[in-house]
């Protein structure tokens, strides 16, 4: 993945170096190429996840998006904090739409681990461009998927995360997303997905440790 992403960005390396040296914004092509890489990587093959792990975008591509956004925000005097982990306090609807997308995908994956085509593979490309058309559909499906979950701890965690992100998002779901908003969407999906995977792994480890102690 690193070599492929490097090739994607190779054509704009001089412009990136110039931006770094001058302290100016990174070229928009950095975000556009990173988003295209993430989209093709997730949509082309949804098998990168497992029953216990949600497929995530390439971390390096997400880091490029973050740097592009931070420089852009600084130059436009928009000091929105972009943290290393999911930020429920971030006032950005596109970011929280990405967070919801990750939760919906994780819910389906847990409820239907053997499904041939997952939510990420089927809906990510359209959700990152036109979230208003997709989020509502996924919300309805997630209710059905939650009912099928036998793991009550997992169901409770997903419901809690859904409530938190829904409160942060509010009722204004964007109809379309521009380049900057799509970058926030991708970061929101990545950070929430990483958080869900981490929480699940920690729960599994704690459960195994408790069972070992009983023995």
Located regions from the model:
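Intrinsic-disorder/low-complexity detector
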Residues: 1-215
